[in-house]
């Protein structure tokens, strides 16, 4: 890549290796490449966060307040790309969905997925009827327990679903770690994990609403 500022070889980094100017982002770079990471599910989130914070400091708007238009635009575009990559890779389910979409495209098999959320990483896949029935019954049980004021039952339901979610994500991690990942099986596990995650989020929101009726 040729640097827009010094017109010399800028290298592959965020900053020109010669003059230090921020370079426009590579539109073809995936979220892993943004952080210079290998494309895999198992990441050290602490290291990822440290890298993210270091990069955001370099791209902080105050550093470009008096820069020319090209420098400000490059830093803004880099920031957008960086934040999107961070939001996706820092969350296990989102990271798994994104990695699955990359692996599926590379294998030439979309696994029935159509990217739909802001990170382009949430897939639409057939949902097992038994899973839908299970989650519906869990929601009904949670609602009834709340109406009765059965705190122990609510806690047990939430703990059970959390355990199910964690089990599915453990299977997802194992699936990606396999020598030849079964993408369809990983996708099915992720569907279940998302449904369990949604239940937990709804349960938490409902609990907060009861604590603060205003």
Regions found by a protein language model. Name each.
Residues 1-214:
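C-terminal accessory/regulatory regions appended to core domains
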């Amino acid at each position: 890549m040729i640097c827009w500022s010094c017109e010399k070889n800028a290298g592959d980094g965020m900053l020109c290796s010669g003059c230090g100017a921020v370079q426009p982002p590579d539109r073809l770079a995936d979220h892993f490449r943004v952080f210079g990471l290998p494309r895999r599910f198992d990441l050290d989130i602490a290291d990822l966060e440290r890298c993210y914070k270091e990069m955001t400091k370099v791209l902080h708007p105050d550093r470009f307040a008096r820069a020319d238009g090209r420098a400000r635009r490059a830093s803004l575009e880099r920031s957008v790309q960086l934040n999107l990559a961070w939001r996706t890779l820092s969350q296990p389910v989102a990271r798994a969905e994104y990695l699955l979409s990359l692996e599926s495209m590379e294998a030439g098999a979309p696994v029935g997925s159509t990217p739909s959320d802001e990170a382009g990483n949430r897939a639409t896949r057939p949902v097992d009827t038994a899973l839908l029935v299970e989650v519906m019954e869990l929601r009904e049980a949670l609602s009834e327990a709340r109406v009765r004021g059965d705190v122990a039952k609510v806690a047990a339901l939430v703990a059970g679903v959390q355990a199910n979610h964690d089990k599915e994500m453990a299977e997802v991690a194992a699936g990606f770690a396999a020598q030849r990942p079964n993408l369809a099986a990983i996708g099915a596990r992720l569907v279940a994990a998302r449904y369990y995650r949604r239940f937990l989020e709804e349960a938490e929101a409902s609990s907060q609403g009861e604590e603060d009726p205003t």
